[in-house]
Amino acid sequence: VAIDELGDLVIKTAAGVVTHRRPVARQTIEGLVQEIPARFQLSQTTPGMWQAGLDVGRYDATQKLVIDPVLVFSTFLGGSRDDQAFGIAVDAQGCVYVCGQTTSTDFPTAGTQRNQNSSGYDVFVSKFSPTGSNLIYSTYLGGNDNDRGFHLAVDASGCAVVVGQTFSINYPISKPFQANYGGGDRDGFITKLSPNGAALVFSSFVGGSGSDDLTCVAVDPVGNVYAGGNSSSTNFPVLKPFQAANRGNFDSVALKLTPEGAPVYATYLGGGGRYDSAVGITVNAVLLFVGLQYVTP
């Protein structure tokens, strides 16, 4: 743990570096806002052990003191119609990636893979500079029906991997492991964009003849891709499965791809309940899925 030259608190953990921005303190007295000096400080409790705290300047102890973190940036992102963000990720350089769905035909695009809404809801993927002052790229992804981006992750090269659901039989694909729409109500999709957002590294349908969604994704240090979701299909494209068959109405599904998009495994994960779905995924020394289950007593 350390305090850098900007006054930010920097904590190194096994999962990476966590930075807490220098705090800002204020009081409002008789309608006037007064800035109060505030900073992080470190104290050594025992040899090798440090404790972080706050050092606050003189203030009126009879009035409320507000201590806030610094807002790095905050911005609108959207067009003239319905825009919703569902997923966010940050890369090693601090660039921010956002995905979701939009019906706007004037959604802001820059450096795009696609610059026009196809129909209804399209997926959007946008990348911001670390300060939020520059929209590095922003693109639509979609076919002739509704498409939604639920989650994304970013690899070490700055490639965004997006997962979601598509109702479009012509969702854009490239080097797919499943080239055709599986049928049924909807399919999941998994799409990897180039670092500048202008090209598809790979993009594939993921689903069978029922309803399929991919809801979460993670990338390991060497670029392997892990995704999870749910499926009502009895013919979901399994490969080297832990569980080969759907055991309920909707089962969770999990899959792993190489950095180039080739499948390593795909499996059901579920019981006999009405609905199972993966809702979160992380990769460290082990692969961890979290999900939900609905069962009938």
What label would you give each PLM region?
Residues V1-S80, G87-V90:
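Residues that cap or anchor secondary-structure elements
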Residues P47, G53, D60-P297:
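A sequence-level/structural motif corresponding to short, flexible coil/turn segments enriched
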